[in-house]
């Protein structure tokens, strides 16, 4: 463990908590390792020894033990992170990498989710368009004739992690997206007209073996490198070298970006209002005939934008903080998003789906918020839609449970 000492001038607590004991003011602090320090207020200056760098690191002995289960072993170095931010680190990563991701949880203006996840320099890219699967690795690109779902399962099995207590819920794996058109890979009876589809892949996944995780609750971060379990002694050495490089990146000073006004061009749709209304009428007909329960009808909007997506995401996370925030670049495609909805979650053998039906704008005050909530929860149409979505989610979960 490396340590550093710094001065705390009188009146400057550096995050320590004042405690009154028999009329004397003390500064009382419990560090990450359970140690306690206390100083009387008469001292003009005190010195506090802070664990600046390494809090905990996976040893070779621990790695050998974990390797017995096969797959990949998460080699972890845990650091203090009270002076590092996810956005600051992302501003460094995006300068030298074109494949990365940032996943955050911002549940309100003043509330943060516990973990933020960052990954870069993936092992491979797996994508498909119209059932043609492409596998892109650091050695090159090739087409695969295997079924996409089988291919995904095989890679997940190869890099499966053992369960290690105390680690974040995600320590490496696939990050990317599945489009709505991906349903035709799972339901053979469904086929979509390729001429009506976008140019984006039906799914696009990056496999990350290196992940940085911020723990906002403990003010620490996890540097994680997944080492293949076979030949663990050699892969452990490489993992330590990768951790050293990741630590150097985390310690790199971050310059504040230059701010400027963004300009958004005219917004256009991929369909006319007449076509939109015509298709809505067709959907209503199918519902009345009993052919479908619901339809998620969408249109694509586009506009020019003179800033990069990172600048857009910085604004998005301030103006629309949500439970699920995302920024990712998959080579030639960039995605930024914000969503409050848990579409599907798998923890152990428990599947959770929490569809959202019905919305109201946020109130300007807490009282107005409560009134809008009351109106939403007693709206007959919203309740009917909610019950329908719960029923559909139950049916979907029932197919795989």
Which role does the model predict for each range below?
Residues 1-18, 23-25, 35, 44:
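N-terminal amphipathic/hydrophobic targeting modules at extreme N-termini
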Residues 13-14, 40, 70, 82:
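Generic N-terminal simple sequence motifs
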Residues 18-20, 30, 380:
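N-terminal hydrophobic alpha-helix used for membrane targeting or insertion
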Residues 29-31, 36, 41:
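Intrinsic-disorder-associated, low-complexity terminal segments enriched in Asp/Asn/His/Tyr and depleted
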Residues 40-54:
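Short, Lys/Arg-enriched N-terminal segments with co-localized hydrophobic residues
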């Amino acid at each position: 463990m490396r340590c550093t000492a710094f001065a705390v001038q009188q009146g400057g607590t550096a995050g320590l908590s004042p405690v009154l004991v028999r009329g004397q003011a003390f500064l009382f602090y419990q560090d990450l390792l359970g140690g306690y320090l206390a100083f009387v207020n008469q001292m003009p200056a005190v010195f506090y020894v802070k664990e600046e760098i390494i809090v905990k690191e996976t040893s070779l002995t621990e790695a050998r033990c974990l390797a017995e289960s096969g797959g990949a072993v998460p080699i972890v170095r845990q650091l203090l992170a009270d002076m590092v931010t996810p956005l600051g680190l992302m501003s460094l990563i995006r300068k030298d990498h074109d494949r990365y991701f940032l996943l955050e949880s911002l549940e309100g203006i003043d509330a943060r989710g516990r973990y933020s996840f960052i990954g870069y320099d993936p092992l491979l890219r797996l994508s498909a368009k119209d059932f043609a699967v492409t596998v892109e690795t650091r050695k090159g690109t090739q087409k695969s004739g295997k079924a996409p779902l089988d291919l995904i399962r095989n890679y997940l099995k190869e890099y499966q992690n053992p369960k290690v207590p105390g680690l974040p819920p995600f320590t490496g794996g696939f990050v990317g997206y599945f489009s709505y058109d991906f349903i035709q890979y799972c339901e053979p009876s469904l086929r979509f007209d390729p001429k009506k589809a976008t140019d984006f892949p039906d799914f696009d996944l990056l496999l990350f073996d290196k992940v940085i995780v911020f723990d906002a609750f403990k003010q620490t971060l996890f540097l994680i490198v997944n080492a293949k379990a076979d030949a663990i002694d050699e892969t452990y050495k490489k993992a330590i070298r990768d951790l050293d490089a990741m630590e150097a990146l985390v310690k790199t000073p971050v310059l504040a970006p230059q701010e400027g006004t963004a300009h958004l061009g005219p917004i256009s749709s991929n369909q006319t209002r007449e076509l939109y209304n015509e298709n809505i009428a067709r959907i209503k007909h199918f519902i009345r005939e009993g052919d479908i329960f619901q339809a998620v009808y969408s249109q694509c909007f586009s506009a020019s934008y003179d800033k990069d997506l990172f600048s857009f995401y910085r604004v998005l996370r301030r103006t629309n903080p949500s439970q699920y925030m995302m920024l990712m670049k998959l080579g030639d495609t960039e995605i930024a998003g914000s969503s409050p909805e848990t579409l599907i979650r798998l923890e152990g053998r428990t599947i959770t789906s929490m569809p959202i039906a019905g919305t109201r704008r946020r109130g300007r005050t807490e009282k107005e918020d409560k009134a809008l909530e009351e109106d939403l929860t007693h709206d007959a149409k919203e309740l009917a839609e909610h019950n329908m979505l719960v029923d559909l989610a139950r049916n979907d979960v029932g197919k795989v449970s």
